[in-house]
Curated annotation (Swiss-Prot):
Protein name stated in the entry: Ribosome maturation factor RimP
Gene name in the database record: rimP
Coiled-coil zones: none
CDD domains documented for this protein: YlxS_C
Gene Ontology CC: cytosol
Lineage of producing organism: Bacteria, Pseudomonadati, Pseudomonadota, Gammaproteobacteria, Thiotrichales
Organism in which the protein naturally occurs: Hydrogenovibrio crunogenus (strain DSM 25203 / XCL-2)
Function: Required for maturation of 30S ribosomal subunits.
Length: 151
């Protein structure tokens, strides 16, 4: 289980009790400048700065007691935004047919970075069309994926 999984299991119940959706989290280690970023959402209405503040206070209290990260870090609570990161297969499914940007931990067909339409989502991977070529990318290799906002 990754650190992010442990943090999600620890925080999800509280965040959902507060009326928000736990969208995901990222831990960005950088010595004493490390960051724990928690993304929350609320169906149809989104989240406000005040919402992020309320959740941040609750999360901070839980993290202080449970202490899953031994190093110093900065806590950020945020909306996923228009370029929302994707963490779970059901999130990918919700954005099937839209443009995404994906970075993998190891090459898939010679590439580690992809930007194109996510044409298919299965239980184990996604298919992204880049410049007319289809790439099947296993979830296990995805380091980061974001929806590309359309204007």
């Amino acid at each position: 289980m990754t650190l992010e999984d442990k943090i999600e299991n620890l925080l999800r119940p509280t965040i959902e009790t507060m009326g928000f959706q736990f969208w995901g989290c990222e831990y960005l280690p950088a010595g004493k400048h490390s960051t724990l970023r928690i993304y929350i959402d609320k169906d149809e209405v989104g989240v406000t700065v005040d919402d992020c503040g309320k959740v941040s206070r609750q999360v901070s209290a839980i993290m202080d007691v449970e202490d899953p990260i031994s190093n110093a870090y900065m806590l950020e609570v945020s909306s996923p935004g228009m370029d929302r990161p994707l963490f779970h297969p059901e999130q990918y499914k919700a954005y099937e047919g839209q443009e995404v940007q994906v970075r993998t931990s190891s090459p898939v067909m010679g590439r580690k970075r992809f930007k194109g339409v996510m044409s298919q989502v299965s239980e184990s991977d996604i298919a992204v069309e880049v410049d007319g070529e289809l790439y099947e990318i296993p979830f296990s290799l995805i380091d980061k994926a974001n929806v590309v906002p359309q204007f």
